[in-house]
């Protein structure tokens, strides 16, 4: 006897960082590095930050007579290991969501009060 599937609502993944944000790494081997978010993966809660978590990949030669290559590439890190970074005051901060006078919902840094969006 097969069980009926319940009507599940689609899962909505919410991230505190977006592509293009400037973030600071707060944990791991790349701690205190600052970089720009290149890509966001909400399903796994991971982000790729420019110049952080570099991995080397050895590529075989494609054709005969061609030499192989060694490529360094950024690997994803978990989003809980990064904080938004204020370039004006050089400080990392958590974010909160507020509304502007015209009713738009924006992200704001808690330490500095700087509006990001």
UniProtKB/Swiss-Prot annotation:
UniProt-listed SUPFAM superfamilies: Translation proteins SH3-like domain
Short name of one Pfam family: KOW
Gene3D superfamilies found in the cross-reference section: 2.30.30.30
UniProt record, GO biological process: translation
Gene Ontology annotations for the cellular component aspect, listed alphabetically: ribonucleoprotein complex; ribosome
Keywords: Ribonucleoprotein, Ribosomal protein, RNA-binding, rRNA-binding
Protein biosynthesis among keywords: no
GO MF term (any one): structural constituent of ribosome
Family the entry assigns: Belongs to the universal ribosomal protein uL24 family.
Job description of the protein: One of two assembly initiator proteins, it binds directly to the 5'-end of the 23S rRNA, where it nucleates assembly of the 50S subunit.
Subunit comment: Part of the 50S ribosomal subunit.
Entry protein name: Large ribosomal subunit protein uL24
Naturally occurring in which organism (per UniProt): Thermosynechococcus vestitus (strain NIES-2133 / IAM M-273 / BP-1)
